[in-house]
Amino acid sequence: MAKEHYERTKPHVNIGTIGHVDHGKTTLTAAITKVLAEKGLAEASDYASIDAAPEERERGITINTAHVEYETEKRHYAHIDAPGHADYVKNMITGAAQMDGAILVVAATDGPMPQTREHILLARQVGVEYIVVFLNKCDLVDDDELLDLVEMEVRDLLSEYDFPGDDIPVIRGSALKALEGDKDAEAQIMELMDTVDEYIPTPQRPTDKPFLMPVEDVFTITGRGTVASGRIDRGTVKVGDEVEIVGLKDDVVKTTVTGVEMFRKTLDEGEAGDNIGALLRGVDRTQVERGQVLAKPGSIQTHKKFKGEVYVLTKDEGGRHTPFFSNYRPQFYFHTTDVTGVIELPEGVEMVMPGDNVTFTVELIAPVAIEKGLKFTVREGGRTVGAGVVSEIDD
């Protein structure tokens, strides 16, 4: 039995470094890998290799992101670090790099700066709930009172965006000194990682969440009934489970799954990530369509009005060449389908330029199964002009 090999020994968590430019995010990432590598838990990545992040394309948007992985005694981590500010914005909004928690890097020499604020706001909007603060470059500040002051400022800023500013752990250190092999600084990095282990909870596995499957295709099997197929987004489904067909219509259809198939073979249980066909009892072909979802009863509702945090593609990324204004009517691509919606810009925002990120309100012309944290693209005549995430449900 060669099954042992696949056992996950440690829980897996995705984290990333966020914070203002030149405050030391990449240096810290390098320092973490170096300090853990000395304990045999990682491969050291140097600053240059992390900084030369490869380009990736996520939903048509070009993003530079460095991925490093390492382990602590307790966990396995995938850590993302993006070189430029624009890369962070795109990363967080598209969910190209899903973060369970973040390390906010603030230089003690500067204190919170504009991008510190922006990254905290983005974390709040896209649903990163846990932040640990690393106060960097503390070796360059002689005065402890000054450090206390900077720490207070950071805590106040976090509280302003509804994070528990008073309770968030703040670790003081110097990433550069740790990279240079200073023992005290290395101990600070270990303290940081112990804190991340303790403070950022292990995320719920996708299979433990309530069942949800966006419907991609519908067909009829003569004598057996209607099959809805798609990729299971979360949770599990098996024969005998009750599910609801939700979206695009005001009425929710309740049904029971009478068969689950994958690659034309029957399956005991489909789980998150599987592409399956679900045979639905007593459902007419006309009652289910692409763009709806199959879901555990009561777990998701339809909405027409929401706020979204959106990155607007530049001309070079294939986006619009011109700005848009309130009452702009593009399509919003949720799950597997486009629905037209009307945009209302926030007060004080006259127009949105390609390359901007913005929070706006959308009113859809049909109800869609949406929830906070759901990703979508904004499209115009079939081409992507923006990428977003639902930050609030408004109806």
UniProtKB/Swiss-Prot annotation:
GO terms for cellular component: cytosol. The gene is tuf. It catalyses: GTP + H2O = GDP + phosphate + H(+). It is an enzyme of class 3 (hydrolase). GO terms for molecular function: GTP binding; GTPase activity; translation elongation factor activity. GTP hydrolase that promotes the GTP-dependent binding of aminoacyl-tRNA to the A-site of ribosomes during protein biosynthesis. InterPro entries: EF-Tu_GTP-bd, EF-Tu_GTPase, EFTu-like_2, EFTU_2, G_TR_CS, P-loop_NTPase, Small_GTP-bd, T_Tr_GTP-bd_dom. SUPFAM superfamilies: EF-Tu/eEF-1alpha/eIF2-gamma C-terminal domain (SSF50465), P-loop containing nucleoside triphosphate hydrolases (SSF52540), Translation proteins (SSF50447). It comes from the Bacteria. Residues 81-84 are annotated as: G3. Residues 174-176 are annotated as: G5. This is Elongation factor Tu. Its main location: cytoplasm. It comes from Ligilactobacillus salivarius (strain UCC118). Monomer. Keywords: Cytoplasm, Elongation factor, GTP-binding, Hydrolase, Magnesium, Metal-binding, Nucleotide-binding, Protein biosynthesis. Mg(2+) binds at T26. GTP binds at residues 19-26, 81-85, 136-139. Belongs to the TRAFAC class translation factor GTPase superfamily. Classic translation factor GTPase family. EF-Tu/EF-1A subfamily. It is found in: Cytoplasm. The keyword Transport does not apply. Residues 10-204 form the tr-type G domain. Residues 19-26 are annotated as: G1. Residues 60-64 are annotated as: G2. Its EC number is 3.6.5.3.
